[in-house]
Amino acid sequence: MLRNLLLRLSKLLLWLIALSVLLVLLLRWVPPPFTALMIERKIESWRTGEAIDLTREWRPWRELPDDLKMAVIAAEDQKFADHWGFDVAAIRAALSHNERGGSLRGASTLSQQVAKNLFLWSGRSWPRKGLEAWFTALIELMWPKQRILEVYLNSVEWGDGIFGAQAAAQHHFGTGAPYLSAHQASLLAAVLPNPRQWSAGKPSRYVNNRAAWIRQQMRQLGGSHYLQRIKPNHPEWWPSWL
């Protein structure tokens, strides 16, 4: 009986692994219609009785401004072009900081944040961290870096019910994502650690200072030239949709 149970569990695990691989492969080309975080926020609103409208409009890579791409990289993951999903040095630094009793510090790369926002629930449990590592590895293996950043910018939370760059640009600045200035892009990146408490449209002194630091980091990283490092290197005959 125990043997049969283990066999069934093994088959179930193999099916779940196969489904996760197929899902990540599909989302390399298909825009995700929603994310796990969006579902979580909706459930949260039902439980609290506070209605919330989720706003999100997909914008393809070519319509997302370089300033926003660079602002997010400068703020969240400056080694994005170099790592394979995990910034080991940042993880070690965060663990050391947390062990010393400081405020909890994260070390999530953009790839890890995409995995978490798309597929997983919030929390710090070990099972969730294990699944995050699994999905991060799949994303890095199957998606080019441009796709990872494209999905991130279209899925990240930028306020209550505000998801993605287009909704954020309209909500905070009354404009479309393609028309964001470098200053506006840096403000959006500055609030990412706490987008439900901080406002890009009405920034505090701290947010303004952080945005100024982000603009400085953007210049030090080389501005839009940095983005050439995450451009897929394909031969001329390679289909554009791959």
From Swiss-Prot:
Highest taxon in the source lineage: Bacteria
Enzyme class: transferase
Catalytic function, reaction form: [GlcNAc-(1->4)-Mur2Ac(oyl-L-Ala-gamma-D-Glu-L-Lys-D-Ala-D-Ala)](n)-di-trans,octa-cis-undecaprenyl diphosphate + beta-D-GlcNAc-(1->4)-Mur2Ac(oyl-L-Ala-gamma-D-Glu-L-Lys-D-Ala-D-Ala)-di-trans,octa-cis-undecaprenyl diphosphate = [GlcNAc-(1->4)-Mur2Ac(oyl-L-Ala-gamma-D-Glu-L-Lys-D-Ala-D-Ala)](n+1)-di-trans,octa-cis-undecaprenyl diphosphate + di-trans,octa-cis-undecaprenyl diphosphate + H(+)
Record's subcellular location: Cell inner membrane
EC nos: 2.4.99.28
Transmembrane intervals: 12-32
UniProt keyword list: Cell inner membrane, Cell membrane, Cell shape, Cell wall biogenesis/degradation, Glycosyltransferase, Membrane, Peptidoglycan synthesis, Transferase, Transmembrane, Transmembrane helix
GO CC annotation: peptidoglycan-based cell wall; plasma membrane
GO molecular function terms noted in the UniProt entry: pentosyltransferase activity; peptidoglycan glycosyltransferase activity
Gene3D superfamilies assigned: Biosynthetic peptidoglycan transglycosylase-like
Membrane topology per record: Single-pass membrane protein
Functional description taken from the UniProt entry: Peptidoglycan polymerase that catalyzes glycan chain elongation from lipid-linked precursors.
HAMAP family in UniProt: PGT_MtgA
Stored PANTHER family: BIOSYNTHETIC PEPTIDOGLYCAN TRANSGLYCOSYLASE, MONOFUNCTIONAL BIOSYNTHETIC PEPTIDOGLYCAN TRANSGLYCOSYLASE
Family listed: Belongs to the glycosyltransferase 51 family.
Designated name of the protein: Biosynthetic peptidoglycan transglycosylase
Organism annotation: Stutzerimonas stutzeri (strain A1501)
Phylogenetic lineage: Bacteria, Pseudomonadati, Pseudomonadota, Gammaproteobacteria, Pseudomonadales
Gene: mtgA
